[in-house]
Design a protein with these regions (language model features):
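Alpha-helix initiation and N-capping motif
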Residues: 2, 21, 25, 50-55, ...
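SAM-dependent methyltransferase catalytic region
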Residues: 49, 61-332, 341
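Residue-level signal for secondary-structure boundary elements
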Residues: 17-20, 33-44, 65, 69-70, ...
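Nucleic-acid modification enzymes, centered on SAM-dependent nucleic-acid methyltransferases
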Residues: 1-29, 76, 499, 504-509, ...
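Long recognition/docking surfaces used for binding and targeting
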Residues: 1-66
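Eukaryote-specific, cytoplasm-facing alpha-helical/coiled-coil scaffolding segments in long proteins
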Residues: 4-11, 83-85, 114, 388-391
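Sequence-level detector for compositionally biased, low-complexity segments
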Residues: 243-245, 272-273, 291-543
């Protein structure tokens, strides 16, 4: 039924495999045959990972096997208490705000997880929907309910093949547990696709993936045309996004289908010199969800993401845009930001609900049909991870738990701030008006090579770099230097070799307060010189 998986397994079982492929498959089979599954499961439950071993096996495996991909794609399983809280909140709000008596179980509800992983969010939504149905109507008609609602109206997208395959297996298990066995011509609508790419894939020649273009076509139709009422999930966190294309650029920067872009504020350009954090993947997924709901005219978004957008000035256009689309926004800041060394208000330890350093927040956003205006509500949740899990596991969404914020131009903060004197504050000159020539700091993009505590050490490195008898692989191995989109190592070495003034680029650098080092300040090495400002610091100056 699932074209891609059918193609892959058919190819492995009956296809003409190369000798290398046969060895790989045989090795995998031997490892699986030798695995003590009961012991693994006992260890899993002993460590308190939750109810769903499929999810954790995948994330743990990827962390060991390919940590770069895990980091690049932002693969972090969502703790089940978080998932349960969000799905319960959506179910409750469908009933109370949209007067849909059966909540997620209603036939008029369409649901999408655009970054599905192993289907943790859709799985929980299905459990809630089936429970609602059984409580109201009993077991009679349950099979028909699953066929005509769950398999018809629930969608999910996933980019990576492994979680895609696991997700389909998991869904088959779940539905069987709920008393429904899928027929040969049925499938759950999880599609292998990049949510942030609107182009249909062309027919591929890769063995075992002949159905990829068909899968892409189905997904594209949902992205572009299918009205979605509920969008949930845990989008990837990746500051250096791999998702850069013309469509995402338009989605973020321009007004699309009436939804204000994130690069404007109060009708004016943001004028941010460094707006790279608006390119983070989680921002793009939130924007995609906002666009789908805005286009549909009503709906709910329930997601857990990086919490930086709540108060970072760069995101003020994003905050205003969300307020222009949604009528009610509920934000639970789960904190846990070790990068900021966050602590609980009483000075006790504050932990993240994920195994990451970046703090996170749950957002539940509601758009009602033909409604105007927006109210933003906020709640803090500090403390130990287990206490946060306990709260999210047991507590239901209650509006009075959240505090109404006074969100004002030009910042539109999504956290509690005293804004009583904001107009007085805004009447003062901005610092960039006082200092018209300004920038952020130098970016070498290769500090370990371009900066040193001792000038002689740095001179040795540059001497090696200019010596064309050394291979570029040497610098990759010893200094982690390699070409990037903005810098070519071969070109830089060649140009520096020809530069007769190469010995004139050593300067003292205040790397951090009271931390003086030496930098090789040349565009052949330093990626962003910030020369308009730094040229004033190169010689004697009050600065």
């Amino acid at each position: 039924t699932i074209g891609i998986l059918k193609n892959v397994f058919k190819f492995i079982s009956f296809g003409s495999l190369s000798a290398q492929m046969e060895v790989i498959i045989d090795d995998i089979s031997e490892v699986l045959q030798a695995a003590d599954v009961n012991k693994i499961l006992n260890e899993f439950y002993k460590n308190g990972k939750g109810e769903d071993p499929i999810v954790h096996f995948y994330e743990t495996f990827l962390n060991e096997y390919d940590p770069e991909t895990k980091e690049k794609r932002g693969v972090y399983y969502t703790p089940e208490p978080v998932v349960k809280y969000i799905i319960r909140a959506v179910h409750y709000l469908l009933k109370t705000k949209f007067k849909i008596a059966d909540g997620i179980a209603s036939n008029e509800v369409t649901l999408l997880d655009p970054a599905a992983g192993t289907l943790t969010f859709p799985a929980e939504a299905i459990k809630i929907a089936v429970e609602e149905f059984e409580n109201k109507f009993g077991n009679a008609g349950k099979e028909l309910f699953i066929r005509n609602h769950i398999l018809k109206n629930f969608y999910a997208f996933e980019l990576m093949m492994a979680p895609y395959a696991i997700g389909h297996i998991k869904m088959s298990f779940l539905l069987e547990e709920l008393g429904y066995i899928m027929k040969d011509d049925e499938r759950f609508k999880l599609y292998l696709t990049n949510t942030l790419d609107m182009e249909d894939l062309q027919q591929t020649e890769i063995p075992g993936l002949e159905s990829l273009s068909t899968e892409s076509h189905y997904a594209a139709n949902i992205k572009k045309n299918e009205p979605i009422l509920v969008i949930v999930g845990n989008p990837p966190y990746s500051g250096h996004s791999a998702n850069r294309n013309e469509w995402t650029n338009t989605l973020l920067k321009e007004e699309i289908d009436g939804a204000q872009g994130y690069y404007t504020i109060d009708g004016e350009s943001l004028n941010e010199k460094n707006s790279k954090w608006l390119q983070d993947d989680y921002v793009k997924f939130l924007r995609f969800a906002q666009w789908k709901i805005h286009k549909a005219g009503l709906g709910i978004v329930g997601m857990i993401t990086n919490h930086s957008y709540l108060d970072n000035p760069t995101f003020r256009g994003m905050r205003q845009s969300l307020m222009n689309t949604f009528n009610e926004i509920y934000l639970m800041d789960l904190h846990g930001n070790s990068l900021k060394k966050e602590m609980s208000p009483d000075g006790s330890k504050d932990e993240n609900v994920f195994d990451i350093r970046q703090g996170v927040a749950i957002a539940v956003m509601i758009k009602k049909k033909n409604a105007r205006g927006c109210k933003v509500y906020h709640k803090d949740l500090f403390g130990l991870r287990k206490d946060k899990y306990d709260f999210l596991e047991k507590e239901n969404f209650i509006k009075k738990d959240y505090e109404l914020l006074d969100t004002k131009s030009p910042t539109y903060f999504f956290i509690k701030r005293n804004t009583s004197d904001i107009e007085y504050y805004n009447n003062w000159h901005k610092i960039n008006e006082i200092f018209p020539v300004n920038s952020v700091g130098i970016v070498t993009a290769r500090d370990e090579f371009a900066i040193a505590f001792e000038k002689n050490k740095l001179k040795e490195r540059i001497s090696q770099f200019r010596n064309l008898n050394f291979s570029s692989d040497f610098f990759n191995s010893f200094y982690n230097l390699k070409s990037t989109g903005a810098w070519d190592i071969e070109k830089a070495r060649s140009e520096l070799f020809k530069d007769n003034n190469y010995d004139n680029y050593y300067y003292k650098l205040l790397y951090r307060p009271f931390d003086e080092r030496t930098i090789y300040y040349s565009p052949k090495i330093v990626e962003r010189m910030r020369y308009d400002v730094m040229r004033h610091m190169l010689r004697d100056n009050l600065g």
